Structures are given as C-alpha cells and as structure tokens.
A protein has these predicted regions:
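A short glycine-rich, His/Asp/Glu-containing loop-to-beta-strand
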Residues: 41-45
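Charged, amphipathic alpha-helical segments and their flanking helix caps
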Residues: 1-37, 48-145
Length: 145
C-alpha cells in the first residue's frame, strides 16, 4: 500500500507542476499550528480505508475494496464576487479540480499489478476558515495481497 501512495503522490506532482505542495494528508489543513506550513495550491492524499475478504480457505490470499481521499486546496484570497474582475478565478479553480480528477479516474500503475484502476465514488467542495477552498474526491479501487 505504501508503494501505491508514493506512486499516486508522484503522479500528481509530475502532472501538476503548478501545485506548491503534494503530500500525504496528515491533518495539515485541520490545525491552526504553523509547525507544518501548507502552501497553496496543494493536494493532500490520505484517509485510506480497506475492507478485506479472503480468496481462499486458508486466508493466505485476500482482496480488498479500498477508498482514498484526494483534497485539492486553493487559497481564495481574491475577491471573486460578480463584477470584481477576478471572476475568472472561479472557473480556474474548477478547471484545476476537473483536470486533477481526469488524471486520476481509471488511473493504474504498471509497476503495481495488485492495485486496480481508481474510480471516483463521491466528490464535494467546501470552504475552510481563511478563504481556503477544498475540492475533495473519494476514489475506490481493488487491491490484492
């Protein structure tokens, strides 16, 4: 699983050089502390959850249905009300979120044959204090061990 997470982070960082940070989600956005400063725009990946089932009677082989959450965080300091001349920032944010999803949907890694392609299960957007807009998607995939 750790190789999958590293491969996913590398894929995002390589395909989205405009991101200032691509990292495992360790709660960086949920704290007011400056110990681990977050720069924007960024993508944080984590909150993995796997439900396992045995493929044989001995339990030596298993298949799991996993989910992982990808959060794109963007600083929305710009005044984006209609007539503000910054209205295009809204479209730019949604475009980046869409491009990120398009790069992840059906993503598979040749060097990880036990990980099956990603499939988006849900998405939402919300705002954190400090004008930080979050575009969050949860992807599912199968994993064998």
């Amino acid at each position: 699983m750790e190789q999958f997470l590293l491969s996913l982070l590398r894929h995002i960082a390589y395909n989205f050089p405009q991101l200032s940070l691509v990292a495992e989600d360790c709660g960086q956005l949920d704290t007011q502390e400056d110990n681990y400063p977050v720069t924007f725009p960024c993508v944080l990946v984590g909150n993995t959850d796997i439900s396992w089932s045995d493929l044989d009677e001995q339990g030596s082989s298993q298949r799991g249905t996993a989910t992982i959450t990808v959060r794109l965080a963007i600083d929305c300091y710009d005044d984006v009300h209609i007539g503000s001349t910054q209205e295009s920032s809204i479209a730019d944010r949604y475009r980046l979120a869409s491009e990120l999803h398009n790069s992840l949907q059906s993503l598979e890694f040749e060097d990880l044959p036990d990980i099956y392609p990603l499939s988006r299960q849900r998405s939402r957007d919300y705002t954190l204090p400090g004008n930080i807009k979050i575009y969050e998607s949860t992807y599912s995939f199968l994993i064998s061990s």
